[in-house]
Amino acid sequence: ECHHVSSVSFEQVLRQVTATFVYGLTATPIRTDGHQPIIFMQCGKIRFTSDAKSQMENQGFKRLLIPRFTSFRSITSDRKTYVQITQELSEDKVRNEFVMEDVKAAIQKGRTPLVLTTRTAHVKVLAQMLMPFADHVIQLIGADSAKEKRLALQNLQSIPISESLVIVATGKYVGEGFDYPRLDTLFLTMPIAWKGNVEQYAGRLHREYEGKSEVCIYDYVDIRVPLCDSMYRKRLKGYIKAGYGKNVTSPAPDKNSQELIYERNNYEAAFRNDLAKAKHSVVIAVPKVKFKYKPSIMSALANLLHDGVPVVVHVKEEGANELELSNAGMDVVCNKEQTLQCAIIDKSIVWYGNINFFGYNSETNNVMRIADYKIANEMMEILYSATENKVNEKSYTLPI
C-alpha cells in the first residue's frame, strides 16, 4: 500500500531510510488529493503495471457488472450534501428491501456476498435484515478495536465452505489489507465517484478460489438524485479499468442481450447500429449541443426522420447549435434543470453515461448500453417530468 508514502508520517520515515533500493506496491498509485508526486519521489517511477486484461487471462472466472436502478427520490427539492444524501439512502426502507432481495437471491445461489456501505449504522441495519437468510452474517466496521477486528477475521477463516456466509462492511474497512478469497459477489449500496475506490473494492473479489467461475458487482444507481447520477457516470471509468467493461449482463429477466461499457473512441459504430434499427422513437438528452463539424450521427438521425421515426433532443444549456437540429427536423427541448445524459431508442435500449452525442468528449467520457425497457421508461419519465414541471423551458420550432 505504498500510496500511504505521501502522508507526513510515512514520508518522514522514508527520508531516514538509507536502502539502496525502495520497492512500492499499490493498486491505487493516483490519489484523490493529488499527492502522488510524493510517492514517485520516494519510490521512483512506475516500473511495471499489471492491468485487468492480463490478470483476467490468467484467471478462470468472468467479471460481470449488474447495474440496479433504484426508485429512490428525495421528498424535497433542496440541494443536499453527500452526507445528507447517504443518510437518506441508508434509511429508506424500500431501497434497503430492494438491495436485500438481490443479496438473498445471491445467497440462495450459493454465492458469497460482500455488502458494502459508507455508514456504520447502515451496516447494522443490513446485517440485521440478513440474519434469517445466511448461516453466518459478519459485520466489519472501521470503528472496531484491533482485538475485535482480529477476532472477526479469525471467525471468517473458520467458517466451512458448506455454510452460507455474507459479510456486511464499511468501504474503509475492506478498502485495503483485507483478503478473503471466497468472496465472489459485491453489492455496492452507496454512491462513490473515485475510480480508485471502485478498483480497490472490486479487487476483493479477484482472489483465486476453487470453484470460482464468475464474480459479480451489483451497483445501485439512484438516477433521480443528480449527485448520485453524476457519481455513477464517473465510476464507470473505474469499472472499465477493473475489467468490467466487456461482460455486463442485464438484470431484467426477459433480456438475454449483452450490454457493454464504451469509451469515446469505440462507441459510435455500436450506437449507430442501434439507431439504424430504431422503428418507433429516439430520445437523446445532452448537456449542450455544440459542434464545429456535423456529428457523424446526424446522417443516421436524418435517415430515421426520413422514415417517419420521431427524434427528440433534450438540452440543458441552450445557445449553440440547437437550430441546426431543428432545421433537420428534430424536436429540441431546452431545460436548465435537466440532469440526465442518455439516449433512449424505441423505449427499450438505453445509452447512459457522460458521452455527449452532439459535442466534444474527453478521453475520460464513457457510456453504458443497457437493453431494458423498464430502465428506458424510468429515464423517459425523469426526462419528461422535469420538462413538464419547468416553466421556463423553450422549444425550438421551424419558422413559418
Feature names for model-found ranges:
Residues 26-29, 193-217, 235-236:
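Conserved SF2 helicase motif VI
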Residues 77-118, 124-129:
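Conserved interdomain hinge at the start of the Helicase C-terminal
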Residues 167-168, 176-191, 200, 216-219, ...:
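A short beta-strand element within the Helicase C-terminal
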Residues 1-5, 172-174, 190-191, 205:
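Conserved Walker B
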Residues 3-64, 239:
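Post-DEXD/H (motif II) to motif III coupling segment of the RecA-like Helicase ATP-binding lobe
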Residues 114, 124-125, 134-175:
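Conserved helicase ATPase core of P-loop NTP-dependent helicases/translocases
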Residues 253-400:
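PLD/PLD-like phosphodiesterase catalytic module centered on the HKD motif
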Residues 74-77, 84, 209-254:
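C-terminal helicase lobe
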